[in-house]
A protein has these predicted regions:
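N-terminal, positively charged nucleic-acid-binding surface of large information/translation enzymes
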Residues: 1-230
Length: 230
């Protein structure tokens, strides 16, 4: 008896649908992480996507690479738990909501309550959740979508605080000073990723005012002439 089905023609879409159907109907992924004969764990952390943006081909490529490692470790006898997650922290979410509602940061707490503003952000940040779930299933990416972690959830935030406490107690955190890009409009610092958002930089023309004064060279003004050609 043949273990695997043979195909006379390569209709890749049809073959893919049949394999996905077999995996789903037989709960293959669930069985692979619940097998008692797999006592050793391989730890895998799923970097969460942001569900307020549509999935793209680069996400498919990255997930394919991650899936290869997880499936290989599964074949080697490891239990490979992989929990899905949603990245919900980020300035782009806030700016998107403010643009849709015609608000500025100054309007929060006056024209709109903080509670309503937060609700709008929670809705916006999960805007394309269904699209992500569909493409995850279609590409056969094995990850636990039933019990995802959500970064705005208090349990997740508390776990991050706990980790920071551990770092602090081990004296791995220190206070320092560094120059960071800042957005006056948003009232917050900007990450490298946020600096690459469309519309962050614009070429503008401005008028510079230059005033000239005569300087008398004496002891009081001597510092102005130091290390110059005078």
């Amino acid at each position: 008896m043949k273990k695997h089905k043979e195909y006379s023609s390569l209709d890749l879409s049809k073959i893919g649908e049949e394999i996905l159907s077999f995996w789903n109907n037989n709960s293959v992924f669930d069985k692979s992480i619940a097998d008692p004969l797999r006592p050793e764990n391989f730890t895998f952390y799923e970097g969460p996507p942001s569900a307020n943006g549509m999935p793209g081909i680069h996400h498919v490529i990255a997930r394919t690479i991650k899936d290869l490692f997880c499936r290989y470790k599964t074949l080697k006898g490891y239990t490979v738990n992989r929990k899905a997650g949603w990245d919900t922290h980020g300035l782009p979410v806030e700016l998107g909501v403010e643009k849709e509602m015609g608000l500025t940061k100054e309007d929060i707490g006056t024209k709109i309550s903080i509670e309503d503003y937060n609700k709008a952000c929670r809705v916006n940040v999960m805007k394309y959740k269904k699209s992500w779930e569909e493409i995850t299933s279609q590409m056969g990416y094995w990850v636990d979508m039933k019990n995802p972690y959500v970064t705005y959830d208090n349990k997740y935030i508390e776990s991050v605080w706990w980790l920071l406490k551990q770092l602090h107690e081990k004296k791995l955190l220190y206070k320092g000073h560094t120059i960071q890009p800042f957005s006056p409009k948003a009232g917050t610092g900007l990450s490298t990723h946020e600096l690459n958002q469309p519309g962050c930089y614009k070429n503008v023309k401005d008028t510079s005012a230059v005033a000239q004064f005569q300087i008398i060279k004496d002891e009081k003004s001597q510092f102005l002439f130091e290390k110059t050609n005078q």
